[in-house]
Amino acid sequence: MSLLTRITTYSAKPALAGAWGVVTYGELGALIGRAQQSLAQLKLDRPTAFGLIGEHGPASTAWLIALAERGHFVAPLSGNAAEHPAKLALINAQWIIATSDIGWQLLPRVDEPSTHPLFTQLSDQGSAGLVLFSSGTSATPKAMVQDFSKLVASYESRHESDLVMLALLGFDHIGGLNTLFNSLAAGSLLVIPLSRSPADVASAVARHRVAVLPASPTFLNLLLAAGVTAELASLRVITYGTEPMPESLLLRLKAAFPRVRFIQTFGTSETGITRTSSPEAGSTFLRFDDPDLEWKVIDDELWLRSRTQIAGYLNASNERFTADGWFRTGDKVEQGPGGTLRILGRLGEMINVGGEKLMPAEVESVVLSVPGVTDCRVRGEPHPLTGQTVVVDVVATASDHEALRSAIRAACRERLARHKIPTRVNFTCAVSGERFKKTRWIR
């Protein structure tokens, strides 16, 4: 059953909740019909590139489905069009759809259609196209082109469910789209909080009795620090991904939410979100349970090949893909028993201290276990003798920083090899959450 057919079938059920109130599947279906009528009035004689501007909401969802159904190309972009001139130019968007809750404006941009070979390839296959951009935190954002028709079809086997879900990642990320399409295919209610602050998320969970919360370990740590666990009593499942989960944080989370099932997820923008399972409760290992995915480990790096991986990049080479379609993720992994894996971190984040290598996540797990530490980031800094040295930036609730610094060093000396012990402990108000955003998303 197609996604659009499912939406029609679920007519009376609530579909999307947010600042606009609650929209039913029937009302969402009517919005999709209006969007399709607007497309018909344009009298387009070929697949066309659209920039879809906005955030999660009824209008943006309606247009995503309408464009996929009609075989067009779409780049979902958060914010407003003025923020994305380079991205709109790169896809040569002929039209801009500026959405806001349940309304939209359809604005012409250029007359000439896009002639990029990847768009032509998808058009020849009769497929719609989806363009997602990498975060671009360290370079120009990469424009990744996906077979949108194939991606949407991958959700057609989902079972109906009444579990209420919450969306944290935006509709311009593969993780945010995965949450959206999973919810729509299951006929569930998807809740969009007013903001991604712990307070607003907790308020949305309490108001709509959210049962499933997809989040990153960093955000889950912020929830604990915010003291809002009492408002999260309705939660039954927390899925986590985007970065390694420190074992010490997982233990704290399980103590704070004893009735919640924790599921580790994994995915990349290039290969999509993968179905996974955990070998046992509380384990930081995962197992891939996806018939559409192949995986292998080469020199401790995870390689993936999936049925829904991207067709290519608009503005970059495919050097991270092998000739036979394997994607080199850049993730360092540890292999466990029974085909399980543990994500240790990004290979590019590895710290080399005098020839001894370590991953930041191992040190972060120890530092986070120290009472008074609410968050931390471990990084390498240049050192004239050892090449690099370990530094940790700490967010703390404790006011006595010297005592906490001593406690952190004592914990590290007790549990870590000498080369892994931070040589400097800095205290700060906040730490960057950008380190892992490039390739991994939650569902």
Language-model segments: residues:
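AMP-binding/adenylate-forming catalytic domain of the ANL superfamily
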Residues: 414-438
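Conserved AMP-binding/adenylation subdomain of ANL enzymes
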Residues: 152-164, 172-211
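Conserved ATP/PPi-binding loop(s) of AMP-dependent carboxylate-activating enzymes
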Residues: 296-324, 356-358
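Conserved pre-ATP/AMP-binding loop-to-beta segment of ANL
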Residues: 11, 112-133, 145, 160-165
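Gly/Ser/Thr-rich phosphate-binding loop
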Residues: 212, 226-283
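AMP-binding/adenylate-forming catalytic core of the ANL superfamily
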Residues: 213, 306, 332-420
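Conserved AMP-binding A3 loop
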Residues: 24-26, 128-156
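Conserved AMP-binding/adenylate-forming
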Residues: 21, 37-80, 168-170, 357, ...
